[in-house]
């Protein structure tokens, strides 16, 4: 029995640490579009099976309307472009989309900015998409392994960039994660400045008026 005591203590310590991290994650880590769209594309209880996917960053999210694509191409598409998404992110977002959908066509948004000044790998915010993937997804674990080769291990598993510890923000986080909109990954429930979500990942930017309109 003495031989197993150190092991038992380690297990208890790790379990306690996981519980503490779970509470912090629930109360302090903000969530939003990335979490919702990843859950939407993987949901199978709504009878959807996309055959076309748009991959890119913010420009693609606001310029590629799945409804218009389907109308002209006879497809059933989803826009998985995510603001801040890198080329490496696109690879894993595509793999995650293919995990639960029979994708036949990929529309890849090519913007010179993606390649002209690509971000250096290893920065602590790099895993902002990886951290929002489902723990049951093998793609998430592939992504974790990839990031561990370049990042400090604590940054791989924690969402430092999304943490907030002010009482008001923690209250908002908890209310959001207990809401029906969050549980159902309802993108339309998100309040976003500058535009509205118009369906299947497409973000409609409101027309600019006044001096900024040019």
Question: Where in the sequence are the language-model features?
Answer:
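Short amphipathic alpha-helical segments, especially helix-boundary/capping motifs
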Residues: 15-17, 40-45, 66-71
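Secreted/periplasmic serine-hydrolase-like ester/acetyl group-modifying domain
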Residues: 125-214
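Alpha-helical transmembrane signal-anchor/signal-peptide segments
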Residues: 28-49
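N-terminal hydrophobic targeting signals that begin at the initiator methionine
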Residues: 1-2
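Hydrophobic membrane-insertion alpha-helices, especially the h-region
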Residues: 5-26
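Membrane-embedded segments
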Residues: 55, 59-146
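Acidic/glycine-enriched edge-of-secondary-structure segments
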Residues: 21-31, 76-84, 203-213
């Amino acid at each position: 029995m003495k031989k197993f005591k150190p092991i038992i203590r380690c297990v208890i310590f790790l379990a306690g640490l996981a519980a503490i991290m779970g509470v912090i994650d629930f109360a302090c880590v903000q969530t939003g579009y990335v979490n919702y769209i990843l859950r939407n594309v993987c949901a199978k209880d709504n009878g959807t099976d996309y055959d076309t996917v748009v991959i890119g960053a913010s420009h693609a999210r606001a310029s590629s309307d799945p409804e218009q694509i389907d109308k002209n191409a006879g497809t059933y598409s989803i826009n998985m472009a995510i603001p801040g998404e890198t080329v490496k992110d696109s690879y894993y977002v595509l793999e995650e989309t293919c995990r639960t959908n029979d994708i036949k066509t990929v529309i890849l948004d090519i913007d010179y900015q993606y390649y002209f000044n690509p971000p250096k790998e290893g920065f602590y915010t790099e895993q902002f998409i990886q951290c929002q993937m489902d723990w049951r997804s093998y793609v998430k674990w592939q992504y974790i392994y990839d990031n561990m080769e370049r990042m400090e291990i604590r940054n791989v598993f924690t969402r430092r960039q999304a943490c907030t510890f002010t009482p008001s923000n923690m209250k908002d986080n908890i209310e959001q994660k207990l809401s029906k909109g969050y549980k159902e990954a309802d993108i339309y429930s998100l309040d976003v400045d500058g535009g509205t979500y118009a369906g299947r990942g497409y973000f409609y930017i409101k027309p600019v008026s006044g001096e900024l309109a040019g």
